[in-house]
Design a protein with these regions (language model features):
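Conserved micro-motifs of the catalytic ATP-binding
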Residues: 125-130, 163-166
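Short alpha-helical segment of the dimerization/phosphotransfer core of two-component systems
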Residues: 105-110
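C-terminal end segment of the histidine kinase catalytic
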Residues: 254-289
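Acidic ATP/Mg2+-coordinating residue in the GHKL
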Residues: 211
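Short conserved segment of the HATPase_c
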Residues: 216-230
Length: 289
């Protein structure tokens, strides 16, 4: 009677040692062996959870490397083809310009890709975020200055006088990526409009970027922040997108203790929402515009 539970405990230990992390003793008694078995099973459950997490992390890294390699290989192959055409000697001026334009466009896209990748990796460090009070008006003014005009898209800003505590550079990058995506969704559509707004609600500053563009199918919404995931690859690449923009936005939001929320309807538009706590009121000069 005494050795039976010990035998089961030994067998469960052997299973775990052999890589079967689902092994449990299943012993339920009101004595010291029962307490030992309960502790062993709890330890085994924790080990199994941690191993599953590590396996999932390895899969994510493997998928990321595969996607990144693909994103590099696809334009590089085409660029080599166009470069070979240029090296072959004098060609039709229109063909030469087409080749040069393609190489320039893809080079800029790869530059953007590498920059976003470096920012993503940098967000993993403990001191990646340097929060300070900043107003929505200052953020929106910076966006209006830095974003190039989007042909056929009206860009509107609606600040509410909210002040948040955020890393200004990162938060501007987050909003800029959302605005670029919204403008891209409106590309080629009559009456395209993107509204960047902020409102105070329940102690938070709620930022929204809304467009009346092509919208996103419901099945794609849960995957939008996956690195290199693109709803429409041809549209994204044609607009210079890398598939890392929303992944970067999600990482920046997470570093600020918040998250992106998406609402979208195909052919009607998309609204992205992200909230930050309002900064405590204090007498201070308005930060430079």
């Amino acid at each position: 009677r005494l050795t039976a539970p010990l035998t089961r405990l030994q067998a469960a230990s052997a299973r775990i040692a052999g890589g079967d992390y689902a092994g449990r003793t299943g012993i339920k008694t009101d004595d010291e062996i029962g307490a030992l078995s309960e502790g062993f099973d709890a330890m085994a459950a924790a080990v199994e959870t941690r191993v599953d997490e590590l396996h999932a992390a390895v899969r994510r890294e493997r998928d990321f490397v595969a996607a990144f390699t693909h994103e590099l290989k696809t334009p590089m192959t085409s660029m080599m083809g166009y470069a070979s055409l240029l090296r072959a000697g004098p060609a039709d001026p229109a063909a030469t310009k087409e080749a040069a334009d393609f190489i320039y466009h893809e080079t800029r896209r790869l530059e953007s890709l590498s920059g976003k990748l470096l920012t993503l990796l940098g967000l993993e460090s403990d001191n990646a975020v340097e929060p300070a009070p900043v107003s929505d008006r200052a953020l929106f003014a910076a966006l209006a200055r830095s974003l190039p005009p989007a042909e056929g898209v009206e860009l509107q800003f609606a600040p509410a006088g909210c002040t948040v505590c955020a890393d200004r550079i990162l938060w501007e990058d987050l909003l800029a990526n959302l605005v670029r995506n919204a403008c891209q969704a409106c590309r080629g559509r009559a009456g395209g409009r993107v509204v960047v707004a902020c409102r105070a609600e329940a102690g938070c500053a709620v930022f929204t970027v809304a467009d009346n563009g092509c919208g996103i199918p419901a099945a794609d919404l849960p995957r939008l922040t996956e690195p290199f995931y693109m709803v429409d690859k041809s549209r994204t690449r044609a607009g210079g997108g890398s598939g890392l923009g929303l992944a970067l936005c999600a990482a920046i939001a997470a570093r600020h203790g918040t998250a992106l929320q998406f609402e979208s309807e195909p052919e009607a538009g998309t609204t992205v929402t992200v909230a930050l706590p309002l900064a405590p009121a204090r007498p201070t000069k308005e930060e430079p515009q």
